[in-house]
């Protein structure tokens, strides 16, 4: 089974068991995004270098036994209306295209505490007012399971 087909819990178990690494998981996700992003428009912000560095650091902590949370090493996407310290958070609006929060939202903190590693920020309707992404300033997102369906 491909790493991309595993649930977050399954992937965390594989990483903890040494069957794969946080770096391999992040690389697989970023490669998939590279292949499909032009079609699906799922992301507003991705910093590949930062994501790979974070995965490397997570893997080092896993191997040292200091990162043991239930999502240790698992790549996660963060919705673009959740503040992420030092990472542009637009809420899918051009009004906030240069907003860089000085803090992490509590949901982001909890994911970090669980050991998750951020891939990037996902597209959404502007200010989360809808479910189709038709109002996103960054384009309409298509459902990756069925492009004829809305993602939300």
Where are each of the predicted segments found?
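An N-terminal boundary/leader segment
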Residues: 1-53
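Alpha-helical scaffold segments in soluble metabolic enzymes
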Residues: 10, 28, 57, 106, ...
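Secretory-pathway/luminal and periplasmic proteins that interact with or process carbohydrate-rich
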Residues: 34-39, 60, 83-88
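Short, polar/charged, Gly/Pro-enriched helix-capping and turn/loop motifs at alpha-helix termini
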Residues: 40-43, 65, 69, 125
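Long amphipathic alpha-helix in the N-terminal Rossmann-like dinucleotide-binding domain
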Residues: 51-56, 115-116
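Immediate post-signal peptide segment of exported/extracytoplasmic ligand-binding proteins
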Residues: 58-74
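Short glycine/serine-rich loop/turn segments
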Residues: 72-152
